[in-house]
């Protein structure tokens, strides 16, 4: 969906010669959506899953698609840089990034419902990250993998998280969701309602491969 939206905006900005907006949106996508979010939650899949893992292969395929899109979107702005990258990646093509067609993204990639779902989930992740930062500041945990997370949610959010692997998306050793509670020791952000978090230090043995901490048998 995000690729569909970016490409639609690219076409609009390009026709209007509005390269500043184009550049700003692409940079924000790289720094906020990719670096600060997608790369963060997918690095364990790339590093720790088996080479034959379907999830790992899907991630690699998506990264290849994103790279191809970014090269074509950035080509009118960063002509030499994109050409250099293209020649490194596609050195056997004997071609140029500037001879490639601009992307044509099928309309079925547009999925506003899915985008809204992820935006709501990012609210939960924001509260969880803020709660873990306090634990880090107090020297109670080091990395997020030293944390066990329990999120307290209203019914709408509880239904939302059924489709998410919470520990993977929070980058913690363990995570679970439960119904909202009025306990006083729970962390919350005033600007985000219906989400509370309890962070405890994970106990057990640290896996030497993924670095997650698992309780013994």
Regions found by a protein language model. Give the residues of each.
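Short helix-adjacent coil turns
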Residues: 14-21
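A glycine-rich helix N-cap at a beta->alpha junction
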Residues: 164-181
């Amino acid at each position: 969906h995000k690729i569909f939206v970016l490409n639609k905006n690219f076409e609009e900005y390009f026709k209007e010669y509005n390269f500043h907006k184009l550049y700003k949106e692409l940079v924000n996508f790289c720094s906020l959506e990719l670096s600060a979010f997608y790369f963060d939650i997918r690095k364990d899949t790339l590093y720790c899953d088996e080479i034959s893992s379907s999830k790992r292969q899907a991630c690699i395929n998506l990264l290849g698609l994103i790279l191809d899109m970014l090269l074509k979107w950035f080509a009118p702005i960063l002509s030499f840089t994109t050409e250099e990258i293209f020649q490194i990646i596609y050195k056997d093509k004997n071609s140029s990034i500037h001879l490639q067609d601009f992307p044509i993204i099928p309309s079925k990639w547009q999925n506003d419902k899915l985008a809204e779902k992820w935006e709501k989930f990012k609210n939960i992740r924001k509260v969880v990250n803020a709660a873990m930062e306090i634990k880090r500041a107090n020297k109670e945990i080091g990395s997020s993998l030293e944390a066990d997370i329990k999120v307290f949610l209203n019914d709408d959010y509880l239904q939302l998280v059924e489709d998410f692997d919470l520990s993977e998306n929070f980058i913690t050793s363990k995570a679970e969701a439960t119904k909202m509670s009025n306990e006083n020791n729970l962390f919350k952000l005033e600007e985000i309602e219906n989400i509370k978090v309890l962070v405890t230090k994970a106990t057990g043995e640290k896996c030497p491969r993924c670095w997650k901490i698992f309780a013994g048998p």
